[in-house]
Amino acid sequence: HKPSQDEINELCWLYGDATLEDAQQLQGFYVGPRREMITPWSTNAVEITQNMSLNGISRIEEYFPVDSENAEHDPMLQRMYNGIGQDVFTVNHQPEPIKYVDDLEKYNEEEGLALSEDEIAYLHKLEKENGRPLTDSEIFGFAQINSEHCRHKIFGGQFIIDGKEMESSLFNMIKKTTNENPNKILSAYKDNVAFSQGPVIEQFAPADQTTSDFFQVKDIESVISLKAETHNFPTTVEPFNGAATGTGGEIRDRMGGGVGSWPIAGTACYMTAYPRLKDDNGKSDVERDWEDIMPVRKWLYQTPEQILIKASNGASDFGNKFGQPLITGSVLTFEHEENGEKYAYDKVIMLAGGVGYGKKRDYKKGEPQKGNKVVVVGGDNYRIGLGGGSVSSVDTGRYSNGIELNAVQRANPEMQKRAYNLVRALVENDENPVVSIHDHGSAGHLNCLSELVEECGGEIDMSKLPIGDKTLSAKEIIANE
């Protein structure tokens, strides 16, 4: 409906004393969200208008005027508009149909799937058994959930050195200490987090989580959760969002421990090549003679200095918006050359970690049974983080800039906080209805949901997944992150 003058006045107030432009078309260049992508900002803004009883508004977006069409922007989330009109939200693109892939080897390289020769041979075998070529969705999905990132094939594999088979895998060596001396460790190396025995503590929570209610204090037997994981590839390619989603991912892992638990505080560690700090005139800001031992490389995406600044900003930004402080961390810069061999953190290391707690009642996952419902909580699906599992499993720079940028997730701490509020409410209840819970991250729905029903199997109706971008293909729906 056409807004009334009162509604226009309320909107002008809401937008910070803005004025209504009485025009059908705005001239000039603008940077704004892609038309097929409803932003988290829009979701929150529309909800505010609904709470103000301003009905009929389905989308609100921000567009920023820029000087030219060459202005910097994030092509994954934004696009350049030469003028803005009434059709700014109109999408005329249809989803790509499911395709049969005739050349596995070529498709593997084009899509950045990082499939090995053995894996391609296995897929050829499946083609013969099925009597047809595999689809792009099947191959893409297999590459994500079978990637090194998701399956730890190197760490869990058997090593043969100088013709001799080693007694243990790297993973078993890591687990050995805990197996022989568990002490207070209750769960490790088999869930999203590790849990150790905690003290009896007071829980201060609403008596009824479904409505406004008084708070009450209860004694609960607690467990302490610990988690750390690297987010190296995304931070090398796009440091702000790479580090932000690193922090966000390890927070989700603590939320998804057992059948739900609470994050408390985080840490972030950064390792890069020498930053070679410069002042505004391009001269060395600090005397660092040792940084000159190796020539400066032509960096693929960002310099070490840019990575340290942007990654630190990204990790802190997510923690601040979510409500988890980063309370400690470390920085290491290193380069070395010896006997013609060069060593440096050209592919950076970003380690996100944290501590949390939960109820001892909830530290073990249950086994889903027939009839249990699969529930997906959080934001809608968009063309973001495609192929992150497979692309992050190989050397950065192996694939094109487009593939690697597409594989980096984008942060949405506000939506994650909403999902956390639900998890917290369920865990604080006297009865937690959750049987098993996993976080949705690398390799998308296919990896998350297959882990969820790993022991029993399950049926997922793809049409019921929360799809925000109606132009997503089947491949993109099952694998977006």
Region locations from a protein language model:
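Short catalytic-loop micro-motif centered on adjacent basic/acidic residues
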Residues: V435-H438
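Anionic-ligand anchoring segments at beta-strand to alpha-helix junctions in alpha/beta enzyme folds, i.e.
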Residues: V453-K475
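Core nucleic-acid recognition elements
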Residues: H1-T396, N401-M415, A419, V423-E431, ...
